[in-house]
């Protein structure tokens, strides 16, 4: 199918190299001469031309690389035994390294296993110790409750000993418990009289520490009476195995005294250092303090000391505890366990004899006393086994290396056999690539050289249009402009195709309003649609964000290609552009039956919309990748579905498979009738792919076509310039249209202006509301087709409105188009004195029409949508402007365009001259700077000018400015870039170079006004 691309870059891009795979013969316009050279003729020209210097250089590089490649293989073939020897050596080293690596992994695994077993034993030891601690604390509470809180006491030595023995199973880690009461010096005499014994010291007459917390049973006779002290802690209750410690003062021993003082001060259980028990095994004493009453957790130390009335101690046999634990955790691989008290610099062994060597793991033990530190050291009892896995793996690697060396030897002989054939094929390939590069550079150079003067031609034609011409001359100029734009469009298509094939086409990411882009596209094809009597409309879903981030130029190019094709191949009916999000389309597909639907914009049937969406899968090369359109995307991304529906001639079934093939036409008759190059749809498909989308279509001959594509864009976090105006807020409108799709389009444009809209299908319903007084709408928009269809009601409606003297009488609008204007229908508006709005509807055009009807005044005086000469003239009159461009034609065009608006223009043909003329102080109000110039480009010239201006501003701040700058606070000359290729990278470079904006070549009044108004409106000079 033939199509025409109306998007693409301008004519100022400097192309160095582009690659075009092929180009078919095409016709420009309706059948003039050849628009470009055919492929065969291009080949002839290329063969006749000498190879360019750059191509020759590349050919020499390619030839040199090939020669080096063949020489390298020849060297390998001649010295293959050295390579084989090196390979065997490398294989041996690799196998040895593998052995070391796997052996290290085995050791790491063994180390992790030891750590796991050691940590498990340490954890269980801590858990069992904590359980015993809890039971000791419960016993302390029992003593406090039944001994100190009862009068008389409910506990005596026999009761305590019996209870301790019967509950010993709850304290499997303790070998005995004892309770000592707190006695002051003043209470000692009475206490000893009540107990029947005197308080004794913990030390014997020999002043040596015993192996237990007091003398043994046979040492009672040698026990000494406790000398006077401030307070005492004599044992009054003890388990039978330790009842020999009854009457001994626990505060008389240094270790026990320190333990008791820390316990009653902290309110927690504390441990002693390891000591030998009566059974000659190491143990520790855990001490808890008994208080008169329950203390809060935040009690202070002195409060705890005052409330202390006794001390409960439990003796732990560490060796028995660890032995019991090891029996419970007997594993397949036994380990040696050693427990140490590491509180002091010299660790004290509490269990085990650390005589082993080798791998060791240390686990920290926490017995609840932060002042004591304990550790568990673990080692394997057996030596590690041989690392058979590492040995076999490394040996296997060595065998593989030897086999690979043998294969390498066979490969060398094989390569030597086919080397000559490969050399011949490489030479042929090199020649083909050289020819392809020459052809691509030729096409790119010729296209660029044609486009550059064409911009000058178009600019001069625009200037010629502003002179006094008669009707015939104006028609000639318009025809020349149309032909020039068609040629530029054709060149842009060729350059885009070359960019795509060379992989140099990139997308920009800038914020833009998609609704405004769609309106601009409708404005572009408005005249052609009206000439052919077609209904042209656009609808954008409310779920589409106001501002998106993407490449508006490429989206405009895709939609323009599709709409342009629809205009070209449609003779009656409509062309309908819609934009939705993917979720909306998917929900519609679930309920759509797929039957051909006549509920359309114009009433003509259209191709199956469902097949248009599903055909995206058909034209995807990989079937499984068709799910990518439905795959989840990032939260800031949005996937859009854009469709162009027409009621044209459709695409023959036999031609549908090659629609997206470059340079392919549906048939030879299409090229003769409609022209075109046949690459617009191919370019569109590539652009859609760059946007992470897909494109497909549904077409039925003599019914129409529906092209659908998806695009993934980003949501903009900034708010867009909503077109809604405060002047339309609170206004209600009624749309009368018997076609629901068309009514929805009208409602969409009204809602963009902030107008609340209601729909009705018949004029009778509107008349009924008018008669009943229930009509709240201030605006009534009636489609002309509905008006003519129900013409029997129109006289009654007009008379009703004329006789209505109310000030809030609704304004009546007729929505007309060439498609709804049969013979005689064009006089309808004049006959009934109605306001007419011509379709296709655009928000800006609708806004102006409604404002005029409501008695408003246009804010900007325009003619045919273009800023008038008077508006620009008021801004540029007598302004001193310098234009910098190395192209004389571009200088003339730019100077002529600015002089037309009253500016006084000075021209400079290089960046160096511009720097000289713009050295401050000077009299210029603004500068238009070309970006690409020889010697010094526009970016560098602008940077140097800004440096000179900053130097002057610093002098002004210091008060050293020249006299002509005495009244100036800050000097800055507006510099606008002149370019025809304003992509994102170019725009960013303009900002980096401190330019103030850009205008396209040739100048367009509307863009020129929007740029210069920022500097010249409301003041005479910007500095």
From Swiss-Prot:
The modification Phosphohistidine is found at residue 448. Histidine-containing phosphotransfer domain (HPt) contains an active histidine that mediates the phosphotransfer. Keywords: Cell membrane, Cytokinin signaling pathway, Kinase, Membrane, Phosphoprotein, Repeat, Transferase, Transmembrane, Transmembrane helix, Two-component regulatory system. It comes from the Eukaryota. This is Probable histidine kinase 3. It catalyses: ATP + protein L-histidine = ADP + protein N-phospho-L-histidine. It is an enzyme of class 2 (transferase). Pfam families: CHASE, HATPase_c, HisKA, Receiver_CRE1, Response_reg.
């Amino acid at each position: 199918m033939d199509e025409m691309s109306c998007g693409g870059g301008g004519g100022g891009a400097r192309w160095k190299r582009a690659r075009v795979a092929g180009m078919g013969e095409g016709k420009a316009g309706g059948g003039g001469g050849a628009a470009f050279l055919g492929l065969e003729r291009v080949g002839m020209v290329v063969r006749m031309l000498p190879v360019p210097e750059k191509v020759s250089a590349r050919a020499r590089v390619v030839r040199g690389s090939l020669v080096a490649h063949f020489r390298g293989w020849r060297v390998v073939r001649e010295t293959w035994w050295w390579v084989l020897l090196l390979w065997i050596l490398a294989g041996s080293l690799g196998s040895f390294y593998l052995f070391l690596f796997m052996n290290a992994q085995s050791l790491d695994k063994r180390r992790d296993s030891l750590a796991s077993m050691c940590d498990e034993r340490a954890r269980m030891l801590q858990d069992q110790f904590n359980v015993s601690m809890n039971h000791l604390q419960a016993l302390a509470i029992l003593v406090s409750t039944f001994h100190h809180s009862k009068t008389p006491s409910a506990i005596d030595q026999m009761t305590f000993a019996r209870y301790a023995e019967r509950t010993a199973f709850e304290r499997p880690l303790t070998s005995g418990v004892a309770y000592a009461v707190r006695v002051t010096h003043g209470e000692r005499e009475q206490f000893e009289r009540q107990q029947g014994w005197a308080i004794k010291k913990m030390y014997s007459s020999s002043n040596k520490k015993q192996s237990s917390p007091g003398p043994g049973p046979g040492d009672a006779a040698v026990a000494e009476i406790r000398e006077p002290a401030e307070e005492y802690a004599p044992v009054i209750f003890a388990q039978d195995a330790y009842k020999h410690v009854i009457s001994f003062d626990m505060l008389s021993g240094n270790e026990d005294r320190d333990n008791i003082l820390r316990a009653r001060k902290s309110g927690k259980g504390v441990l002693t250092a390891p000591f030998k028990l009566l059974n000659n095994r190491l143990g520790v004493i855990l001490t808890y303090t008994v208080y008169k009453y329950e203390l809060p957790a935040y009690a202070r130390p002195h409060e705890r000391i005052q409330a202390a009335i006794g001390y409960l101690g439990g003796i732990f046999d560490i060796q028995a505890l660890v032995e019991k634990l090891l029996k419970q955790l007997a594993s397949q691989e036994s380990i040696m366990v050693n427990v140490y008290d590491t509180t002091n610099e010299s660790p004290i062994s509490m269990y085990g004899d650390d005589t082993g060597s080798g791998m060791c793991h240390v686990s920290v033990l926490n017995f609840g006393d932060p002042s004591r530190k304990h550790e568990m050291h673990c080692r394997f009892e057996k030596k590690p086994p041989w690392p058979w896995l590492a040995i076999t793996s490394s040996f296997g690697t060595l065998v593989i290396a030897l086999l690979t060396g043998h294969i390498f030897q066979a490969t060398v002989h094989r390569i030597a056999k086919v080397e000559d054939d490969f050399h011949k094929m490489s030479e042929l390939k090199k020649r083909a690539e050289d020819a392809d590069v020459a052809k691509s550079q030729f096409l790119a150079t010729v296209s660029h050289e044609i486009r550059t003067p064409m911009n000058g031609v178009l600019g001069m034609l625009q200037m010629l249009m502003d002179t006094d011409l008669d009707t015939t001359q104006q028609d000639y100029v318009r025809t020349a402009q149309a032909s020039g734009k068609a040629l530029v469009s054709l060149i842009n298509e060729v350059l885009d195709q070359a960019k795509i094939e060379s992989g140099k086409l990139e997308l920009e990411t800038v914020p833009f309003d998609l609704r405004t882009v769609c309106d601009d596209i409708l404005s572009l094809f408005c005249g052609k649609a009206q000439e052919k009597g077609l209904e042209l409309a656009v609808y954008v879903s409310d779920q589409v964000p106001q501002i998106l981030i993407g490449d508006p130029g490429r989206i405009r190019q895709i939609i323009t290609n599709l709409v342009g094709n629809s205009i070209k191949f449609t003779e009656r009916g409509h062309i309908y552009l819609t934009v939705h999000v993917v979720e909306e389309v998917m929900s519609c597909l679930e309920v759509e039956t797929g039957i051909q639907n006549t509920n359309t914009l114009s009433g003509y049937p259209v191709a199956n919309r469902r097949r248009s969406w599903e055909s995206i899968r058909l034209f995807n090369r990989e079937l499984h990748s068709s799910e990518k359109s439905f795959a989840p995307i990032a939260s800031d991304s949005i996937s859009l579905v854009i469709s162009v529906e027409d009621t044209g001639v459709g695409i023959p079934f036999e031609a549908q498979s090659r629609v997206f093939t470059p340079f392919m036409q549906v048939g030879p008759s299409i090229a003769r009738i409609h022209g075109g190059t046949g690459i617009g749809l191919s370019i569109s498909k590539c652009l859609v792919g760059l946007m992470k989308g897909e494109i497909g279509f549904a077409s039925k001959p003599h019914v129409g076509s529906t092209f659908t594509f998806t695009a993934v864009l980003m949501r903009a976090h900034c708010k867009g310039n909503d077109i809604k105006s405060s002047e339309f807020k609170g206004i209600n409108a009624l749309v009368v249209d018997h076609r629901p799709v068309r009514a929805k389009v009208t409602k969409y444009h009204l809602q963009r202006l902030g107008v609340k809209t209601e729909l009705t299908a018949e004029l009778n319903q509107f008349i009924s509301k008018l008669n009943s007084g229930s009509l709240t709408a201030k605006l009534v928009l009636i489609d002309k087709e509905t008006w003519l269809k129900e013409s029997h009601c129109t006289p009654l409606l007009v008379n009703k409105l004329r006789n209505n003297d109310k000030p809030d009488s609704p304004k009546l609008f007729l929505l007309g188009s060439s498609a709804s204007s049969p013979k005689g229908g064009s006089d309808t508006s004049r006959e009934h004195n109605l306001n007419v709005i011509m379709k296709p509807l655009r928000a800006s055009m609708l806004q102006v029409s409604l404002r005029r009807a409501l008695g408003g005044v246009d804010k900007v005086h325009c003619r045919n949508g273009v800023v008038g000469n008077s508006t620009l003239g008021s801004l540029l009159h007598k302004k001193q402007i310098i234009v910098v461009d190395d192209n004389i034609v571009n200088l003339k065009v730019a100077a002529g365009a600015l002089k037309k608006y009253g500016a006084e223009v000075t021209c400079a043909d290089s960046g160096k001259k511009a720097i000289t003329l713009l050295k401050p102080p000077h009299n210029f109000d603004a500068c238009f700077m070309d970006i690409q110039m020889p010697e010094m480009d526009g970016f560098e010239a602008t940077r140097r000018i800004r440096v000179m201006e900053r130097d002057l501003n610093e002098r002004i701040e210091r008060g050293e400015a020249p006299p002509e700058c005495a009244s100036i606070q800050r000097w800055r000359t507006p510099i606008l870039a002149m370019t025809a290729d304003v992509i994102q990278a170019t725009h960013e470079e303009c900002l980096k170079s401190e330019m103030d904006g850009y205008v396209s070549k040739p100048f367009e009044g509307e863009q020129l006004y929007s740029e210069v108004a920022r500097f010249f409106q409301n003041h005479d000079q910007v500095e």
